[in-house]
Structures are given as structure tokens and as C-alpha cells.
Amino acid sequence: MGRAMVARLGLGLLLLALLLPTQIYCNQTSVAPFPGNQNISASPNPSNATTRGGGSSLQSTAGLLALSLSLLHLYC
């Protein structure tokens, strides 16, 4: 009974670690509407939101994976 619960917890943490970076990525790429009194420039914005935050989300994914694997190794 205890091993099954720990295995489910580990798989849940792994699933959360895989889905969390996609949620962060989707929130960063949302586009806000422009106010009517501003000019829209044709040049692209150099600080693109898709290039930020990739390392930290990968690092948190690796950390959660290591935590879940260590819990599985400890209890199973």
C-alpha cells in the first residue's frame, strides 16, 4: 500500500514537472492589446518573451525529477 502511494506521488510530481514549464511558456507569450494613441512599429522587439525563462524552467524540471526519483528509490 505504501509503495503504490509513493509511486503515484512520484509520477504525479513528474507529470507536474513536465507540465509546469509549458504553462509558464504559454503565459509569457500572450499578447496584450495596444492602446489607440500609440504608433505600432514594424521592427521586431529584441526582448522576445519566448527566449526568457527557459533555463530556470528546465532547472526546476530537473530538480523535481531528481526529487521524485530519490523518493521512489527511498521507498520502493
Curated annotation (Swiss-Prot):
Pfam families: CD24 (PF14984). Residues 1-26 form the signal peptide. One of its GO terms (biological process) is regulation of cell-cell adhesion mediated by integrin. Keywords: Cell membrane, Glycoprotein, GPI-anchor, Immunity, Innate immunity, Lipoprotein, Membrane, Signal. The record marks N45 as: Not glycosylated. It is a lipid-anchor; GPI-anchor. Glycans are attached at N27, S30, N39, S41, S43, N48, T51. Residues 37-57 are annotated as: Disordered. It comes from the Eukaryota. In lymphoid, myeloid, and erythroid cells. It is found in: Cell membrane. Disruption phenotype: Cd22/Siglec10 double-deficient mice develop autoimmune disease, which is not observed in single-deficient mice. GO terms for molecular function: carbohydrate binding; Hsp70 protein binding; Hsp90 protein binding; protein kinase binding; protein tyrosine kinase activator activity. A lipid is attached at G53 (GPI-anchor amidated glycine). InterPro entries: CD24 (IPR028029). Residues 54-76 form a propeptide. The keyword Lipoprotein applies. The identity of the N- and O-linked polysaccharides is not reported in PubMed:1530634. The O-linked polysaccharides on Ser-30, Ser-41, Ser-43, and Thr-51 are probably the mucin type linked to GalNAc. One of its GO terms (cellular component) is microvillus membrane. Interacts with SIGLEC10; the probable CD24:SIGLEC10 complex is proposed to inhibit HGMB1-mediated tissue damage immune response. Belongs to the CD24 family. This is Signal transducer CD24. The gene is Cd24.
